[in-house]
């Protein structure tokens, strides 16, 4: 697929203006570190991570998986999401115009941290009668931050008189903000024990379906964007 993004660093340089009196300027110095290409490989990566995780759960760690389900937890889910969803959100960030290397690193880490708070939520709430929502709330903070940053870039693009974000950008921002939050809603329904979510296994099935939809939808949206240019 013909697609590429140059990834920058924005370190600063100090330029001496005069020695007497001492004076200098601080100037940003954007440098291209590398170019992200091979979009097909990136799209395949999070799908492959998910496939490998499901293979391991089904054939290698199935006994542990079933034992954990009885305790109301699935750590393997969170391990997989920490990588696959973080790759997804970094890719989305690049489509929205975030090309600074360290901003992308922070987005990846913040998203992965949010996911591991989900793991912690299940781990510490296996047995208590009263649910401890601290990991959930902390996860919301770390997980919501990248979306604030991406929304800021999107709004800045809207405010520019020279450019207009393509329809694809509107779609991907809206669809994936909704998709990412459905995972959070699923967790709330599980721990509140609402209707069918009283059964932990029902929530587990919902996670599997949501994961499949999110990954497949992103892959197709990107494919359509590249070939149809909408």
Question: What is the predicted function of each stretch?
Answer:
Residues 1-74, 85-230:
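Polytopic alpha-helical membrane-helix bundles and their juxtamembrane interface segments
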